[in-house]
């Protein structure tokens, strides 16, 4: 076969791959074919590897897209969390949650503890694990969510915005109960929490014991209703009072001296 004929074939394959939106196939078919010859692979093994590369690239791009669409303030994975610096945390339980069973069962997860104890990191880590499982995820703070819902209500767009929040397979509400909110705002937040109860998962981080949530929602009846929805079948993980960030920094300094 002439060099010119081979060049035409390669160009045709690239065009076919482009038409079929098989970017990885178009970009790697030649190098993988050369590698297959070196490894003495058969045609089926080569084709399996080539299509496998396409599938893997699409999966990785999908994960990256879902992570971007989730609006994490910072990407933090559970693999990055130094459980050795927080031995009081139930590492096995958290890793089990990362497998995603709570998502299919629409169970809430609540991280409760002082500032700096790793709540946001672990919540983000679970959410990124969900992105890897092809779930639609959205991260927000309680204040951001309430502001968005209040603005939507003022613009007569509350139903549209609320429905969008219901479509996510997982939402993370960070910094719940950090600041008090007006009753009207608390009612809007309750709509989201109640609407997702037993339908879709939610992860919440808070620095307040449940007995003190009336500091955020002064209306005792509304506060109780919100807690009832959030804690029903919930995985409640207490992160304690000792700063994970401080201990991690301290251990790094000790390690550097060694």
Predicted ranges, named:
Residues 14, 18-74:
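Interdomain "pre-motor" coupling segment immediately N-terminal to P-loop NTPase/helicase cores
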Residues 1-15, 252-258:
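Intrinsically disordered, low-complexity and often Lys/Arg-enriched segments
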Residues 89-167, 216:
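Conserved P-loop
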